[in-house]
Amino acid sequence: MALETEAKNSNATATSDATATKASGKAKETNNTAGGKKNLNPIPNSNHQNSNQNLVNGNGTAADGPAAKKKGKKNRNKSPPEPTTEAVLSNGHAEKSTLVDAVEDNADADANANVEKPEDGGAPDAEADGEDIDLDALQDVGITVNISSPGADLLCVQLSSMELVQEIHQLLMDREETCHRTCFSLQLDNATLDNFAELKAISNLEQGSTIKVVEEPYTMREARIHVRHVRDLLKNLDPADAYNGIDCTSLTYLNTITQGDLLDKKKTRPDSVDCTPPEYVTPGVSEPPLLPLHPNVKNAKGPQALKVLTTSAWNPPPGPRKLHGDLMYLYVVTMEEKRFHISACSKGFYINQSTDDTFNPKPDNPSHLSHSLIDLLSHISPSFRRAFQTIQKRRTMRHAFERVATPYQVYQWASPTLEHTVDAIRAEDAFSSKLGYEEHIPGQTRDWNEELQTTRELPRKTLPERLLRERAIFKVHGDFVTAATRGAMAVIDGNVLAINPGEDPKMQMFIWNNIFFSLGFDVRDHYKELGGDAAAFVAPRYDLHGVRVYNAVDVEGLYTLGTVVIDYRGYRVTAQSIIPGILEREQEQSVVYGSIDFGKTVLSHPKYLELLRQAGKHLKILPHAVLNERDEPVELCSSVECKGIIGNDGRHYILDLLRTFPPDVNFLKLQDVQLSKELVDMGFPIEHRHKLCCLRQELLEAFIEDRHVSFIRIAAVHLQQLNAKKQSEKAEGNPVPALEGAEAVSKVNGADKTDVKEEKNEENEKAQSTAGDTKTAEAMVNAIREAQSNVATSNEVQAAEVVKRACAAVGSLKEKEFDFRFNPDVFSPGIRHVDGEEGTCSSLAKQKVLVQEAAEFLVLKQIPAFVKEHMTHSSPPIDGQSLTESLHSHGINVRYLGKVIKILNQMPRMDYLHRIAVLELIVRATKHIYYTYMQNTEPLHLSAAISHFLNCLLTNGPVNPAVSSEEAHKKRGNGGKHNKHKSSKGGKGQQQQQATGNQNGSSSGSSNGSSVSDWTLMTPRSLWQQIRKEAKVYWDWELDCDSIETAVSKYGILRISLLRAFCLKVGIQVLLREYNFESKHKPTFGDDDIVNVFPVVKHISPRATDAYNFYTTGQAKIQQGMFKEGYELISGALNLLNNVFGALHQENGSCLRMLARLSYLLGDAQDALAIQQRAVIMSERVNGMDHPSTILEYTHLSLYSFANGHVGMSLKLLYRARYLMVLICGEDHPEVALIDSNISLILHALGEYELSLRFIEHALKLNLKYFGDKAMPVALSYHLMARTQSCMGDFRSALNNEKETYSFYKSQLGENHEKTKDSAECLRLLTQQAVLLQRKMNDIYSSGKLTSDLPPIHITPPSMGSVLDMLNTINGILFVKISRKDIVKVRSEIEKHFKADSPENEVNDAISSIVAAANNNGEAEDAVPKDVEEQKEAGTQLTNGEKAAATEATSS
C-alpha cells in the first residue's frame, strides 16, 4: 500500500488561539473540510515506495519535481535526491538537509536575511552556526502507523514524529472512506491520545503501531459541526461559493479544458487530433464573447443528494427532551420526496415521529441509530446513497489544489445565474456576528491586536523559529483580513451599530468583532487644509503603505496596527485592530509622540526616537527638529502626523503613517519652490485635489542608487587625477600619499553601502547598464581602499577634498560623507522647522532641494527608463493591473499616467502599451465618478443604478433607467445605515462632483427624494464629459473622446475589456451572458444583469524572508549556468513557502513555474509538465482565471504538453491563452504574436496548413509592427510562413519569405552562422521545388495533358522533433550543441581568466567560446540550455523568476 501523509496546516500552535481554532475545525482552514487546507502528500522514503504516487504540492523535498512523476521515469539529467536524512521542520514538512547546507554554503548571498533587522543580534555567520545545531536537532525519519476505523479497511500512513495527533484527525476527515466522521478520538493501547500532543511525545508509539478510531458521544457543539460538515461534503462540487465569494473558494478550469488530468493522458497521434480552433480564437475577432470565460458552467454542479437539509423549527429541544439527551432536530426532504424529522442525541442520529404540525420526539419504528448522519441518510434514501458516492468519487478525482482554500478571497467579475437553495446553515452564518466556529473558542471574540502583536514577538533567531513566526503572522493576518472585510460590508449594509450613534452619520465609527471601522470622510475638518474629503479618502491608502514598509523593516519593539482598507458600494472603510486602552481615554492623553493637530502641538519620546531612528535608517527618513507651540525644538524621526501611543499592554504603537515618505512637489503648488525648466515645460506643478501626494519607496531607492553610482564615478575620477598628479611629482615610485581619499570613500561605503546593496537587489535590472559603465571606476576605488590599509599617509586634506567635491556634485546632505535621507515634513503646511547651518544635513534648504531633485528624477529619468525597458517587449504588461505594477516597480505613481501616455503616444511601436494605459486611465477616472454616484443611490435602487451606469459607460443606445415596478411599490423613507451615509455625503460627494463636473444635477446634501432620482439623470454624454474632465483635472491629460464609440475607434479599446477592467476595479459582478453593446432598441444592461457587488480589499502581504533568500540565491546560480544547484535552491524556496503560506500562494506559483522551466531545460519534459500543471491551477485559483499570470502559465504548459506528445491538449491550452489575451487587451499585442506563432507551428505539424497560415500571417504583422523588420521574431515568422506555404505548394511566396529570413541572418549573424547556412539550404530546396513545379505547369500548358514521366514534388511534413525545436526557439529556449572537446577548451579558457584575475570578462568570453563551438557544428554529445534573451530580465522578484536562465555553460 502506498504510504501517505498530509501536509501540515499553515497554522501551528503559534497564535494564542490556534489550539482552539484547530479543535473547532475552522471552516476556512478546512475549505468546508471536503478538500481541506491539508492535502495528502506522500513523503519519499528510503525505498521509494511512493514513486508512482501523485505528489500534491511538492513541498516535501528538494526533488519536488522528480518526486512528482507518475510513471516512475528515471531522472537522467539531474542527480537524484538523497533519499536518506530528512530534516523535518517544526510543522512536519520533510526537508532535505542538503537545502539547509545550501543556505549555509551561500551565506553571503543570504546574509541580507537579517540586514533589515540588525537587532536580531549576531552576524549571519553566527546565525548559520546556530542554525546548524537546531537543524540537527530537527532530524527525523518519520513513523509508519496503521489506523483502524469502524467499517473501513486498515489504513497505513507515514507521518512525521513532529506532527500533532490533530493532523491524523484532519487526514481522516479528508479521506473518502472516513470523511463523514467528525466526532471521534484516537486511541493507542486503549489510551486516548491528546489532540495537541506531538507524535514523538507518545511513549508507546512505534513503527507499525495501530491507532484505533473510536466514536465519541456528541455534544451540542459537535453535533452542529457534524451537520455543517455533512452540508459541506454534499455541496463540495457546487461552484456557488466561489461565485458568491465566500469561504476562500475560487474557480479553476484547467481540468475542464484538458478534460481530465494531463498526466494521466496517453500520447496522441497527430492524425487523431481535433485541432479546429473555435471561431472566437481565430485572428480577426473584433469583440470576443463572454461565455467561454467560464466553460462547462452547466455541468459544474454535482448530482443532488437531498432536496432539503436544514435545522428543524422544533429547535431547541424542550427541557424534558434535553434530559433524554436530545441535542437538536433536523428536517430532511429526500429526492424521493419523503420528509423526515431527525433527532441528534449524544449517541448519534435517528428518525423521530415528529411532523410539520406535531411534535413527537420518540424514535420512529423501526428505529435506526447511526453515529454518522451520512450513514442514516444512506439507510433511508437510495438516491442519497448513489449521489453521495458519485460526489465523493468526483471530489477525490479533483486535483488537490482545486480543493484547498486560497489565502485571500478571489472574486469573479462574471457569474452565471445561480440557483438559490434552502440552507439553514448559510442563513445562520449570514446573521451571526462571528466567523465560522470562532464563537466556540475561549474568550468568545478574538483579540485581533493581541494576536497580531504576539505573533510578531515570536523568536526569530533560527530557521525553524522564523518559519514558525512567519507562518503564525501569515495565518493571523489572513484571518484578520477576512474578518475585516466581512465587518466592513456589515457596516455599509447597515448591520452594525455605531459607537457614536448620535453624531452625523459620516462621522460615525464602529466596532465589530474587536475591529475598529471608520469611513473615508473628513471627520471634524482634520484634512481641511490638505484637501478635505479628497485627502480623507486617500489617507487610509497612504497609511497602509506606511504600515507595509514599517512591517517590512520589522524593528523589534515597534508595533503597527493591523490595517485593511476596503472599498465597498462606493464607500471607503478603514479597518484597524484596537490598541489596548485607547477607547478608555482621550486621544490627547494617549499620544506621547508626534502631533494630533498637524504640527501645532508636537511631542517627542526617547524610546520612540530610538525605535524610529532604527527604522529610519532603512526607510531613508532624516531625523529633524520642529518647533512646538512654546517655540521649543522637538526632535522627530518620522513625519509630524505619525503618532506614538503606548498601549495598556506596554507596547509602543505607531499609527497615522500617511506621510512616511517625502511629498511629491510636482503635484503641489508651493510658494518657495521653483521647478526646473524641463518640468515647467511639461506642465508641472499640477495642483492635485489633495496635498498628501508623496513619492514611492521604490523611487527613493532608485534615486539613491543613481546618486551613489555618480558619487563613485566622480570620486574615482578625482582620485585618478590626484594619483596622476602625485606620480608625476614623485617619479621615484613612492606610495601615493592621496590614499586617504579612498579611506573616506571606504567610510562612506561602510556607512551607507549596506543599505544601498539591498536597493541594488531591488533595482537589479535598472542599474545594470549604469553599473556596467562604472565597473572600472569602482575597481579602482576598491584597489585604492585595499592599498590604504597597508600604507600610512599624511595627505588627508587632499583626500577629504576629493570626497567633499564628489558629495557636493551629487547633492549629499553631508559635506564629507555620502548621505541621502529625506525629511517627510519639509513642505508640510503649518510646521515650523528648526533650520540648521548651511551645508549640514539639518539645513532646511538642502533638504528641500533633495526632495525636489527626487521628484525631478522621477520625471526625467524613471519615466523614460520605464518606456525604454518596455521597448524590448520582453515582459509586456497585458492589463491595467500589470501596467500599474510595472510603474510602481520603477517608483512611478499612477498620477503620472497622463504624462506616460503622452510619451507613448509618440511611439508607434508602443501602441499596445498606449492603449492599455488609456484604458486604465479611463477606468480610474470612471471609478472616481462611480463612487460619488453610488453614495447618492438608495439601497432600493442599487441594481437599477449600476446597470444604468454601465449602459451610460459602454453603450450609445437607449439608457432610460426604468425603476422596476417591484421597486416602485417599495415607497420607503430614510431606512438603513447606508442611507444615512448617503444623505450626509456632503464631503467627498460634493467635493468630487465639483472636481469632476458632475452633470447629473445631484446635490450631496439634498433630500432623500431628490437623491433617489439623482442617478436617473445621468446620460452617456454627461458621463463621458465627466470622464474627460476628470482625466484633465487628475492626470493633466486630454481624453479626446466624448463617447464609447469614439473611444473604441480612436484608441482601439474593446468594450468587453473595459467592462472587465471596470468591474474588477470597483467590485461589480455581472451576469455571464453575451452582451449586445450595439443594441439600438433596448438597454444593453438590465437590473437582472447585476448579480452582486463585492468589496475591493487592500492589505499588506507578509513575506517569507528565508524562502525569498533561497529563491534569489537559486536565481544567481541559474544565471551562472548551475541549473541543478539552482533547481535545489528553488525547490528549497518552495518548501519554505509551503511552510509559511500553505499550499496555495502567488509566490508558490512563481516557484513552480521556475521549477517547471528548469526541469524542461534539464531535459525532463514529463517532470516539467507535472509541475507546470500545478502552477496553472494555482494561478487560476489565487490570481484569477483571467489574470495575466494565468495566461503566461497556460502558454508554458502548452509547450511542455507538446514536448510530452499531448499535441491536441497543447493546442487547446494555447487557444485558452489566446482567448484570455484577446478578452483582456485585444489582438494587437506582442504576446498575441508569440501565442499565434506557437499555434501556427503546431497546426503546421498537424497538416492544417491553411489555418496555420492565418495565425502566422497575424503573428508576422504584429512582429513587424512591434519589433521592426530587423528583428529575430520577424525573421522566424518569415521562416515559419515559408515552411507553411511550401507545404501548400505555394513555392513562389515561400521563396520570397525565406529570402527575408536569409537576408536578416546574413546581415545580423554573418554568412558562416549555422542559421544563415540553414536558411540558404532552405532557399536552395525551395528554388528547386519551384523550378520543378514551373516545368510541370509549363508542360501542362503546352501539351494540354499531364505527362507521367515528370518527377513528383515531394512535400515532407515536418517531424515532431523539428517542430519542438522550433517551438523552443520561438519561446526563447536555445539548446546549444557542444562537443566534449569544446567544453574542455571553455574550461581552460575560464581557468586562465581566473588566474589573470579579470572576472569581468569571464562570462563574456565563456559565452563567446560556446557560441563559437556552436557555430563549428560540434558533436552533439552535450546540450547546454542557453537563454540569452531572457537573462536580462532576471530580477530578484519572485514574479519575474522564470525569466532567469543561464548564459554560462561551465557547469556542464
UniProtKB/Swiss-Prot annotation:
Subcellular location: Cytoplasm
Keyword check for Cytoplasm: yes
Renumbered residue ranges of the record's region Disordered: 1-93, 266-288, 726-775, 962-1013, 1414-1452
PROSITE patterns: CLU
Regions that span the bilayer: none
Low complexity: bias regions: 8-24, 990-1013
An annotated Gene Ontology molecular function: mRNA binding
Keywords assigned: Cytoplasm, Phosphoprotein
PANTHER family: CLUSTERED MITOCHONDRIA PROTEIN HOMOLOG, EUKARYOTIC TRANSLATION INITIATION FACTOR 3 SUBUNIT EIF-3
Protein's UniProt name: Protein clueless
Organism from which the protein derives: Drosophila erecta (Fruit fly)
The organism's taxonomic lineage, starting at the top: Eukaryota, Metazoa, Ecdysozoa, Arthropoda, Hexapoda
Gene: clu
